[in-house]
């Protein structure tokens, strides 16, 4: 059976996408513009009262059952573990789910210390405090990361990090993954 030109082109594109997905990559200008526009649209989440109040409550009184959580313990937990599911089933997790659109592949809200307050699905890491996706928003700025294959979703995505603001003060971060193929 002869191999068609379309098969070769399709295979080359798939290989190129997979090779590029293995590491961070630069987005085409038109995709960058779409990411910027989506980040601007999502910026209202920074002052969403449900998000702000949940982060303030968590910062004031972190749940005792998570005070000893480590990255290693977190990675060992199943997505079905009740302590993991609590983050997607809590009121903020449900609020995030209601806000999700077809372009959002993941979303998590972190407290000032980088630990989780809520998410759509289990994150790869328990704390992102040392990552730019949390540090930049905690400085009151928007973070837009490179396109990369996300470990938790398995999709090529760009992460947008926004500050959670109490007035003008950053008190936490929101990281929203945008599927590159969905933009």
Positions of predicted regions on the chain:
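Boundary of Sec targeting at the N-terminus
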Residues: 22-25
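Helix-start (N-cap) segments at beta->loop->alpha junctions
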Residues: 176-183
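Bacterial N-terminal signal peptides that target proteins for export
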Residues: 1-11
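Extracellular structured ligand-interaction cores
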Residues: 13-14, 104, 173
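Extracytoplasmic/periplasmic sensory segments of membrane signal-transduction proteins
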Residues: 27-124
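Bacterial N-terminal signal peptides
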Residues: 10-19
């Amino acid at each position: 059976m002869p191999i068609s030109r379309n098969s070769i082109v399709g295979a080359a594109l798939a290989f190129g996408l997979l090779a590029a997905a293995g590491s961070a990559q630069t987005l085409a200008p038109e995709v960058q513009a779409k990411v910027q526009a989506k980040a601007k649209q999502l910026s209202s989440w920074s002052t969403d009262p449900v998000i702000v109040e949940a982060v303030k409550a968590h910062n004031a009184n972190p749940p005792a059952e998570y005070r000893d959580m480590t990255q290693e313990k977190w990675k060992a937990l199943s997505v079905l573990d009740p302590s993991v599911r609590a983050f997607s089933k809590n009121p903020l997790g449900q609020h995030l789910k209601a806000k999700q659109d077809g372009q959002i592949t993941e979303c998590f809200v972190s407290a000032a210390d980088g630990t989780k307050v809520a998410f759509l699905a289990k994150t790869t890491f328990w704390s992102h405090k040392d990552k730019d996706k949390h540090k930049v928003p905690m400085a009151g700025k928007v973070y837009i990361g490179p396109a990369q294959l996300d470990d938790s979703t398995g999709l090529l995505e760009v992460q947008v990090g926004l500050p959670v603001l109490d007035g003008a003060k950053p008190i936490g971060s929101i990281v929203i993954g945008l599927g590159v193929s969905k933009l």
